[in-house]
């Protein structure tokens, strides 16, 4: 999976898809009532990028629905995953729960269209901290309450705050969620050690728990040499500002025989067996 990073404007969806991204990551902020309001990343952000661009969240969601709905004139077949970077670390457990319920309602109304001509992409909810875990509970509860439990097949979770992996695994067990990604990374302005990333990959490969890690990705990776390095480590995904560079590297002899871009036929909630 190649996740285009900080895709917070409508036109950037097309821009990053044209560069080869099969997934986009966008930021989501919340208002004082814990409702998703904008696709916005404040200053600072990645080096070489312009911070502060945004759309109204529901308008953005409707736009990407069209981009991921077969038969729509704007449909992009290769765009198969939407990742939400949820800016909610300051919310309490109960507030996180309410935010999750609101998010589910917005997806039902503006993306899944309550079952009529719905967007088909997989959804990855990147939650900043395990202290916000009730966001996922609220999200699931709302879908079940409204009778749309089937959409849970499309939704996965990622705790993105570089927290202790054992603590994350414990929370995942309580959540009883099988659709688990694990991230590790830092802004492209800095470098980061790989010990935690290697530990996440090891847990993915060795932990047979039903609620264990299924995919591991790293962020934000922009240099060709770094992309090669992380692919050799065994990541499933790379978040980048330059999806075309990942696409280029995947075509190189070293990787072309064993790795390729994921498609809609690839289940993001299952471990890859190469």
Swiss-Prot record:
Cofactors (names): Mg(2+)
Residue positions with a glycan: 66
Top-rank lineage group of the source organism: Eukaryota
Keywords: Cytolysis, Dermonecrotic toxin, Disulfide bond, Glycoprotein, Hemolysis, Lipid degradation, Lipid metabolism, Lyase, Magnesium, Metal-binding, Secreted, Toxin
Name under which the protein is recorded: Dermonecrotic toxin LspiSicTox-betaIII1 B
Active site: 5, 41
Pfam families, sorted: GDPD (PF03009)
Note: The name 'Dermonecrotic toxin LspiSicTox-betaIII1' has been assigned by Binford et al., 2009 to AC C0JB92 and AC C0JB94, both derived from Loxosceles spinulosa specimens collected in Namibia (Grootfontein) and South Africa (Borakalalo), respectively. To distinguish between these proteins in UniProtKB, the letters G (for Grootfontein) and B (for Borakalalo) have been appended to their names.
A molecular function GO annotation: phosphoric diester hydrolase activity
Family membership: Belongs to the arthropod phospholipase D family. Class II subfamily.
Tissue expression per record: Expressed by the venom gland.
Summary of the function given for this chain in its UniProt record: Dermonecrotic toxins cleave the phosphodiester linkage between the phosphate and headgroup of certain phospholipids (sphingolipid and lysolipid substrates), forming an alcohol (often choline) and a cyclic phosphate. This toxin acts on sphingomyelin (SM). It may also act on ceramide phosphoethanolamine (CPE), lysophosphatidylcholine (LPC) and lysophosphatidylethanolamine (LPE), but not on lysophosphatidylserine (LPS), and lysophosphatidylglycerol (LPG). It acts by transphosphatidylation, releasing exclusively cyclic phosphate products as second products.
Broad enzyme group: lyase
GO cellular component, one term: extracellular region
Binding positions (Mg(2+)): 25, 27, 85
Cysteine-cysteine disulfides: 45-51, 47-189
Location of this chain's protein in the cell: Secreted
Cofactor note: Binds 1 Mg(2+) ion per subunit.
GO BP: killing of cells of another organism; lipid catabolic process
EC numbers for this chain: 4.6.1.-
Native source species: Loxosceles spinulosa (Recluse spider)
